[in-house]
Design a protein with these regions (language model features):
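His/Asp/Glu-enriched, well-ordered alpha-helical/loop segment
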Residues: 1-79, 83, 88-96
Length: 104
């Protein structure tokens, strides 16, 4: 749905898996049949952009010898109810193996 989304990975994942507005609204125009699984939504935010940038061997997934770029959230977005995805908070962000943000 880019470029209409806000760029926040929580909102992006929610939009992909729920196909609802931020307040939970959806009607026929939201095409709920186009929802994706959480696994596919995660790939859309991680490995797919790396692949599109020809960088899938360096980033896009957590693997040995890949650049360590990742975030840790206050809850598991793969396991909580869909509306909860919007409420999780970043706890830690690592970029190129260095801590860029840590919630105190």
């Amino acid at each position: 749905d880019a470029p209409v989304e806000l760029g926040d990975p929580r909102i992006e994942l929610y939009a992909a898996v729920a196909r609802r507005s931020l307040d939970g609204f959806a009607d026929a125009n939201w095409h709920l049949e186009q929802r994706v699984s959480r696994e596919e939504g995660l790939r859309m935010l991680t490995l797919a952009p790396a692949y599109a940038a020809f960088q899938e061997t360096e980033r896009g997934s957590i693997e040995v010898r890949k650049q360590a770029d990742f975030s840790v959230f206050s809850a598991d977005p793969m396991a909580i109810p869909e509306p909860g995805i919007l409420k999780i908070e970043p706890e830690l962000t690592v970029i190129a193996g260095e801590v860029a943000y840590e919630r105190k």
